[in-house]
Amino acid sequence: MSLDSLKSRIPDYAKDLKLNLGSVIGNSGLPAQQLWGTVLSTAIASRSAIVLRELEPEAKANLSPEAYTAAKAAAAVMAMNNVFYRTRHLLSDHEYGNLRAGLRMNVIGNPGVDKVDFEFWSFAVSAINGCGMCLDSTKQVLRKAGVERRSSRRRSDCRGTQAVAATLDAEAFS
């Protein structure tokens, strides 16, 4: 199970996805923790058993136990936050924006890894889940930490996992 195995499953009509996945993951130039934490958290966020099954072992092999757990925690907490804050944002009754969230999010304050790495993973998951408020929030944390826009986008750029997940899941029903 690996990136190469996942790429081999992508059908010919989605060759662009195969090439993009290879360049985004295979040639990122990122430190292993940033890259593989993003790969793991976005594979989880893609909700595709195929993608997760193929990428998780390689991510686990390239991450410390703490980073592996933190990447999974980023996917978990952002799945909750993305739904809550996206709903709050989409409601036409803006009074909902004044209500307390009442959600436990302790892992955000103490993720067990470098805070910037955790925020990158959260940013990538929020992009997949389509939560603009969460994207803005994580972007602000990254900018305050001195991360430039280009660097932030590049480090959290695993959008290919979502496209591959959708394609392979559709192929499973063909």
Swiss-Prot record:
Keywords: Antioxidant, Disulfide bond, Oxidoreductase, Peroxidase, Redox-active center. It catalyses: N(6)-[(R)-dihydrolipoyl]-L-lysyl-[lipoyl-carrier protein] + a hydroperoxide = N(6)-[(R)-lipoyl]-L-lysyl-[lipoyl-carrier protein] + an alcohol + H2O. GO terms for molecular function: alkyl hydroperoxide reductase activity; disulfide oxidoreductase activity; hydroperoxide reductase activity; peroxiredoxin activity. The keyword Ligase does not apply. The active site is at C131, C134. It comes from the Bacteria. Its EC number is 1.11.1.28. GO terms for biological process: cell redox homeostasis; response to oxidative stress. InterPro entries: AhpD, AhpD-like, AhpD_core, CMD-like. Antioxidant protein with alkyl hydroperoxidase activity. Required for the reduction of the AhpC active site cysteine residues and for the regeneration of the AhpC enzyme activity. Belongs to the AhpD family. Homotrimer. This is Alkyl hydroperoxide reductase AhpD. It comes from Streptomyces viridosporus. The lineage of its organism: Bacteria, Bacillati, Actinomycetota, Actinomycetes, Kitasatosporales.
